[in-house]
């Protein structure tokens, strides 16, 4: 009984120092092998999918061709280009260039 009373404060201290889920689950930059390791951790046996952009898509992104005459103004073209860029946003843009959480990584699991 005396031994139990000695370890009780230590046990209470360990319980109080346990990280809360919100603290342990921080958004962060994940690039290269760190991103792959995080995907393996999150997806497990389900696996994950990743289709990298080809070199051509990276160097020369396709912007919808507009007909001449009666086309949108320059401001509208910028808005359209931003929308196209948002649609092509992938895991590298989401987690390496920006920051992401493990919950966001789950979107890439099979």
Curated annotation (Swiss-Prot):
Main location: secreted
Residue stretch(es) of the prosequence: 57-87
GO biological process, alphabetically ordered: cellular response to glucose stimulus; cellular response to oxygen-containing compound; glucose homeostasis; glucose metabolic process; insulin receptor signaling pathway; positive regulation of protein secretion; receptor internalization; response to cAMP
Cellular compartment(s): Secreted
UniProt entry keywords in alphabetical sequence: Carbohydrate metabolism, Cleavage on pair of basic residues, Disulfide bond, Glucose metabolism, Hormone, Secreted, Signal
Alphabetized GO MF terms: hormone activity; insulin receptor binding
PROSITE patterns, per the entry: INSULIN
Keyword flag Signal: yes
Region forming the signal peptide: 1-24
Disulfide bonds: 31-96, 43-109, 95-100
CC per GO annotation: cytosol; extracellular space
Keyword DNA repair in record: no
Protein role: Insulin decreases blood glucose concentration. It increases cell permeability to monosaccharides, amino acids and fatty acids. It accelerates glycolysis, the pentose phosphate cycle, and glycogen synthesis in liver.
Assembly, per entry: Heterodimer of a B chain and an A chain linked by two disulfide bonds.
Stated family: Belongs to the insulin family.
Protein name in the entry: Insulin-1
Organism listed in the record: Rattus norvegicus (Rat)
Lineage: Eukaryota, Metazoa, Chordata, Craniata, Vertebrata
Annotated gene: Ins1
């Amino acid at each position: 009984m005396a031994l139990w009373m000695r370890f009780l404060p230590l046990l209470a201290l360990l319980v109080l120092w346990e990280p809360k889920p919100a603290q342990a689950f921080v958004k962060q930059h994940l690039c290269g092998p760190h991103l792959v390791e995080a995907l393996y951790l999150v997806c497990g046996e389900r696996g994950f999918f990743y289709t990298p952009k080809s070199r051509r898509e990276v160097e020369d992104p396709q912007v919808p061709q507009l007909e001449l005459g009666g086309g949108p103004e320059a401001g509208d073209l910028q808005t359209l280009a931003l929308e196209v860029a948002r649609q092509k946003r992938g895991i590298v843009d989401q987690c390496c260039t920006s920051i992401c959480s493990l919950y966001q990584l789950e979107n890439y699991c099979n």
